[in-house]
Regions:
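Small beta-barrel nucleic-acid-binding modules, primarily SNase/OB-fold domains
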Residues: 2-7, 14-164
Length: 164
């Protein structure tokens, strides 16, 4: 392959990558969505616009149930059942982003609120003892609150703090 062909191939590759990146829109500061599926205790699939999008709830970490080559962790199935009861498929949501809009898996990162009553889903999962706090910079808006809510659940021995 000549140098000219290598340069041409490089330019085409860069343009293709740029076009693909441009197709991935960040989450606006606030967006309406509807639940399609609950993946596990901290990951859901929603309809955003007309597209299915995977959302990772910011600030919480529920026990694993779907991680490849990883055993189902204590209280993981219960965390999944709990979020299914909070926001079953069809539930209208309001999603709020923080500083960084995607994680290293490409999932959108969001604080999730039920549209009808404003329930802060991330908080409810934490306060009922179905998650541990997970603070990853720069998405730290509620990190102190999550630590407080987890401490409260632990003191009260709710959820995983009692079972595991």
């Amino acid at each position: 392959m000549t140098t000219r062909h290598k340069v041409t191939a490089c330019i085409i590759s860069c343009c293709t990558l740029w076009a693909c990146a441009a197709d991935v829109e960040p989450l606006p500061a606030s967006a309406s969505a509807r639940v399609l599926e609950i993946v596990d205790g901290d990951t859901i699939v929603v309809t955003l616009g007309n597209d299915p999008v995977t959302i990772r709830l910011i600030g919480i970490d529920t026990p694993e149930t779907k991680k490849p080559s990883w055993p189902v962790e204590c209280f993981g199935p219960e965390a999944t059942t709990f979020i299914q009861s909070l926001i079953p498929p069809g539930t209208a949501l309001i999603l709020h982003r923080d500083v960084e809009s995607r994680d290293h898996f490409g999932r959108l990162l969001a604080y999730v609120f039920r549209h009808d009553d404003g329930l802060f889903v991330n908080q409810e999962i934490m306060t009922q003892g179905f998650a541990r706090p997970l603070s990853i910079a720069p998405n730290l808006t509620y990190s102190q609150e999550f630590a407080y809510w987890a401490g409260e659940a632990r003191r009260e021995r709710r959820g995983l703090w009692k079972a595991c």
